[in-house]
C-alpha cells in the first residue's frame, strides 16, 4: 500500500509539473504575441515617416536619412 501511495504521489507531481510548464509556455507565447501586436499598432507602414517613437511596421526598414519606411 505504501509503494502504491508513493507511486501515486510521484505521478501526481509529474502531471502537475507538466501542466504548469505547458501553462507557462502558453502564457509566454501570449505575451510575445501581445508585444508584437502592441508594436504593430504604433508602427509606420511602407512609404510613411519613421522615427524613434514610431518605428516601421514588421517587414519594413527605416531609411534614417529620409525617415521613410521601405521594404
Swiss-Prot record:
Tissue-wise expression: Expressed by the venom duct.
Disulfide bond sites: 43-57, 50-62, 56-69
Main location: secreted
Propeptide residue interval(s): 18-42
Cell compartment(s), UniProt: Secreted
UniProt GO MF annotations: ion channel inhibitor activity; toxin activity
Keywords assigned: Disulfide bond, Knottin, Secreted, Signal, Toxin
Secretion signal span: 1-17
GO cellular component: extracellular region
Source domain of life: Eukaryota
Family membership: Belongs to the conotoxin O1 superfamily.
Domain notes: The presence of a 'disulfide through disulfide knot' structurally defines this protein as a knottin. The cysteine framework is VI/VII (C-C-CC-C-C).
Name by which UniProt lists this protein: Conotoxin LvVIIB
Amino acid at each position: 500500500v505504501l509503494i502504491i501511495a508513493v507511486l501515486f504521489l510521484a505521478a501526481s507531481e509529474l502531471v502537475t509539473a507538466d501542466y504548469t510548464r505547458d501553462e507557462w509556455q502558453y502564457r509566454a507565447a501570449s505575451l510575445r504575441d501581445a508585444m508584437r501586436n502592441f508594436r504593430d499598432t504604433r508602427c509606420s507602414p511602407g512609404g510613411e515617416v519613421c522615427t524613434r517613437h514610431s518605428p516601421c511596421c514588421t517587414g519594413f526598414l527605416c531609411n534614417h536619412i529620409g525617415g521613410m519606411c521601405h521594404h
